[in-house]
């Protein structure tokens, strides 16, 4: 089997990349999805809040996915469901398997990786205590309730204040459960401010910052959860314990980009994002293999995933048509206050209008300036009244400014203000 482009993942990232590649003249495209339907995680996100940037209207997750799925059908783009990709070779040969076709070897001129991300589990955070039933990741509980029609519990405690945890606090409340509290290890929430307002404050659900779970009690089913305040080293403070009677503990303790295939292929990874190192075209360290969406870094909004994936799809089309320009790479370095940047490097020759750089900060900051520097010269200077790790930031660097860069790297950092 031979294709011009193979997209691995039929979620919002994969769909947007495939559609954009077709719009840019790529004929033979195949989308491979391991679930039984297209749309990815959106199919279980039945709440609203999607599409405000992309469609200028508020949609639910399935409605947002449906618009892209319909477009895929209209453009007659081929796809395979219930299909597991086993590996991708550096020569862009995809090994995949399903029950209908059996084992397949698919040759591609270009590949887009759009596998999304997965949740961290109890094992990844080493919570002490017994191992009864009733402990779920927030996303698993979301799928059970919204898609499978099962109620996971009646008295619930949520560890972690990521967006999925906040949304599930509201969802469980609406389904009749009593949400005792949301508990967060860090001194700040990992979720969007609007989700804290709409999911916790509106339903009087308490949020305990700088707290964590220190014990889990229960034989067959979860019976009690003990939380405690933590010090600046994130160690529990004796004497601050609070015990809750509950039958369910939901974990919203972070998302990890799903990069098992990327690592197997030998793609260069960034330990800060847990995703591939990409350039201005969302191309990885292996020419012709592109990556987009949550497989690169975890996004706040699906609208941003769609926009980034379109860039990857258009770039893959350029690669297939042999229109990529050669050039010297310039690196993007993280300065004070910046956890990571995406892309990590760029070639001016392939930036048509602007270079969009996405980043997260490492703490809560107020009244700062976000600066981009070429050596000692400040080339972009933005006022930022409020910055938080839970909200992704973006800097747009115009092509004209990029052309004037003299060094082989630019530095993005925070300057001045209050921490």
Where are these regions (language model features)?
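Conserved mixed alpha/beta catalytic, RNA-binding, or beta-rich assembly cores of soluble enzyme
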Residues: 21, 111-114, 120, 127-129, ...
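A conserved FAD-binding loop/helix module that cradles the flavin
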Residues: 292-336
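A Rossmann-like FAD-binding core segment of flavoenzymes
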Residues: 67, 72-89, 94-96, 173-260, ...
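Rossmann-like nucleotide/phosphate-binding core characteristic of flavoprotein oxidoreductases
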Residues: 1-4, 81, 317-419
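FAD-site-proximal beta/loop scaffold in flavoenzymes
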Residues: 113, 135-145, 248-299
């Amino acid at each position: 089997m031979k294709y011009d482009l193979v997209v691995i993942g039929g979620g919002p990232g994969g769909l947007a990349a495939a559609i954009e590649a077709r719009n840019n003249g790529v004929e033979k495209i195949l989308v491979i999805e391991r679930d039984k339907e297209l749309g990815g995680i959106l199919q279980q996100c039945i709440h609203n809040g999607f599409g405000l940037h992309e469609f200028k209207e508020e949609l639910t997750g399935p409605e947002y996915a449906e618009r892209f799925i319909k477009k895929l059908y209209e453009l007659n783009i081929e796809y395979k469901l219930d299909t597991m990709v086993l590996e991708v070779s550096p020569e862009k040969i995809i090994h995949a398997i399903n029950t209908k076709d059996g084992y397949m070897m698919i040759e591609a001129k270009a590949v887009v990786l759009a596998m999304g991300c997965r949740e961290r589990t109890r094992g990844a955070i080493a919570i002490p205590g017994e191992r009864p039933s009733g402990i779920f990741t927030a996303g698993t509980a979301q799928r059970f309730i919204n898609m499978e029609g099962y109620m996971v519990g009646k008295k619930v405690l949520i560890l972690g204040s990521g967006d999925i945890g906040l949304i599930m606090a509201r969802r469980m409340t609406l389904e009749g459960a009593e949400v005792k509290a949301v508990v967060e290890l860090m001194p700040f929430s990992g979720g969007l401010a609007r989700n804290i307002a709409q999911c916790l404050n509106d339903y009087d659900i308490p949020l305990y910052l700088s707290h964590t779970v220190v014990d889990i009690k229960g034989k067959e089913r979860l019976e009690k959860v003990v939380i405690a305040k933590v010090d600046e080293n994130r160690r529990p403070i004796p004497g601050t314990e609070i015990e809750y009677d509950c039958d369910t503990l939901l974990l919203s303790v972070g998302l990890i980009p799903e990069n098992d295939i990327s690592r197997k292929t030998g793609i260069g990874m960034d330990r800060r994002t847990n995703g591939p190192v990409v350039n201005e075209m969302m191309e990885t360290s292996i020419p012709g293999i592109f990556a987009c969406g949550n497989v690169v870094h975890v996004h706040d909004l699906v609208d941003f995933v769609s926009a980034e994936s379109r860039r990857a799809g258009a770039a893959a089309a350029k690669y297939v048509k042999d229109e990529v320009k050669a050039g010297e790479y310039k690196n993007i370095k993280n300065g004070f206050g910046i956890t990571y940047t995406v892309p990590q490097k760029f070639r001016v020759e392939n930036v048509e209008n602007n270079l969009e750089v996405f980043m997260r900060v490492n703490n809560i900051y107020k009244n700062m300036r976000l600066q981009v520097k070429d050596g000692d010269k400040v080339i972009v200077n933005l006022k930022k009244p409020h910055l938080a790790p839970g909200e992704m930031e973006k800097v747009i660097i115009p092509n004209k400014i990029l052309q004037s860069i003299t060094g082989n790297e630019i530095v993005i950092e925070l300057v001045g203000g209050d921490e």
